[in-house]
């Protein structure tokens, strides 16, 4: 099916791609259908128009159709306007320093951003259709005061008032990592219109000390612990390469520490080979040494019984063609031989066109609740084959 279906690129004298030709075939005995993606560049070589095969065919037939995406840029290369057949148009107004000042879109949404002398955003105003303009966000930056310098806040965001509340960042690390965060939520469900001063913003928040999270990092940047707003603390241990080795949890008010995951091993390229969960479940993985593709994924219970043992097969371009679960037996039900194998077939554009596999004889589909079942293990022999086809 994939014979004589190359991908061809057409390059103009400036070295810019102007067309990409793909050949579509769904069945082996079908003739190939040429699909052309069209691109247009301006005088200086910037992409300004794009057409997919559908709109390119209409254009070639003489029908006046707009491109899928038309973009306009300034002399300095900044994005000014885009017009999409799907998302509509969007207009941007940048400042002389490259900062975004205002933007409009086809839905009637207007967004305006104010900046400080260092071109950092300090306030974001939003206006939709006939609604009055409101301040949706305000950002406060650390100064060069002794207190900000003591907590490494100079030049960092120390308070961010957003549509859901306020995020306080009282302390940073030497390399810029957040060491503490306090989140205050709005006292009302209505979208906020943040005042200028902090004294006027604080009454809009829920009373109390807020939700505080704290992090600790090693000198090389790895996270050592995290304490959440409920007082639960997670501890992280790393190996010599700085990769995560285990995670432990200490619940609030308890002195005992429980293991969530441990004994994490990696390949030379950083892929996880195995890990041991806190309940004794072990996850084992293997990869192709030539390209790093996942070859198998297994879950082993504490009694060394495999609950899942998946193996994967791929086509030459990396699409999954089959998944086999060796932990499940071959079943026979309703005059069918049901093997624990899922297979996938693709067209010449590598779009999924057929999928086969196995499922429960009474699958629970739709939003309604599943049927009532008597207490006890389900009947594992009531499986049947299924097949799905896809058209684009």
Where are these regions (language model features)?
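Beta-strand elements of repeat-based all-beta scaffolds
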Residues: 1-392
């Amino acid at each position: 099916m994939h014979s004589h279906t190359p991908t061809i690129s057409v390059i103009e004298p400036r070295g810019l791609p102007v067309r990409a030709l793909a050949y579509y075939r769904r069945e082996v005995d079908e003739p190939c259908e040429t699909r052309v993606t069209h691109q247009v560049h301006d005088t200086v070589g910037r992409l300004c128009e794009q057409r997919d095969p559908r709109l390119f065919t209409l254009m070639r037939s003489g029908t006046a159709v707009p491109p899928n995406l038309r973009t306009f840029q300034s002399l300095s290369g900044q994005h000014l306007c885009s017009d999409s057949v799907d998302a509509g148009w969007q207009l941007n107004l940048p400042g002389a320093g490259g900062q975004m000042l205002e933007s409009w879109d086809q839905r009637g949404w207007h967004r305006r951003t104010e900046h400080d002398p260092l071109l950092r955003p300090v306030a974001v105003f939003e206006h939709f259709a006939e609604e009055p303009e409101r301040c949706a966000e305000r950002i406060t930056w650390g100064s060069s005061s002794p207190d900000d310098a003591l907590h490494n806040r100079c030049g960092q965001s120390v308070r961010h008032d957003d549509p859901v509340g306020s995020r306080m960042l009282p302390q940073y690390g030497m390399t810029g990592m957040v060491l503490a965060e306090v989140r205050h939520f709005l006292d009302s469900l209505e979208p906020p219109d943040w005042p200028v001063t902090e004294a006027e913003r604080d009454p809009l928040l829920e009373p109390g000390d807020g939700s505080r999270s704290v992090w600790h990092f090693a000198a090389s940047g790895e996270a050592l612990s995290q304490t959440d707003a409920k007082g639960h603390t997670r501890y992280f241990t790393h190996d010599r390469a700085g990769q995560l080795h285990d995670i432990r949890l200490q619940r609030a008010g308890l002195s005992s520490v429980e293991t969530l995951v441990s004994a994490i091993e990696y390949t030379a390229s950083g892929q996880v080979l195995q890990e041991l969960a806190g309940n004794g479940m072990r996850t084992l993985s293997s990869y192709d040494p030539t390209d790093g593709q996942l070859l198998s994924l297994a879950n082993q219970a504490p009694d060394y019984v495999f609950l899942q043992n998946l193996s994967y097969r791929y086509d030459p371009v990396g699409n999954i063609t089959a998944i086999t679960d060796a932990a499940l037996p071959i079943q026979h039900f309703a005059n069918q031989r049901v093997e624990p194998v899922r297979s996938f077939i693709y067209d010449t554009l590598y779009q999924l066109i057929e999928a086969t596999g196995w499922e429960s004889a009474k699958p629970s589909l739709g939003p309604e609740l599943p049927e009532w079942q008597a207490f006890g293990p389900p009947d594992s022999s009531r499986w049947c084959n299924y097949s799905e086809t896809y058209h684009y």
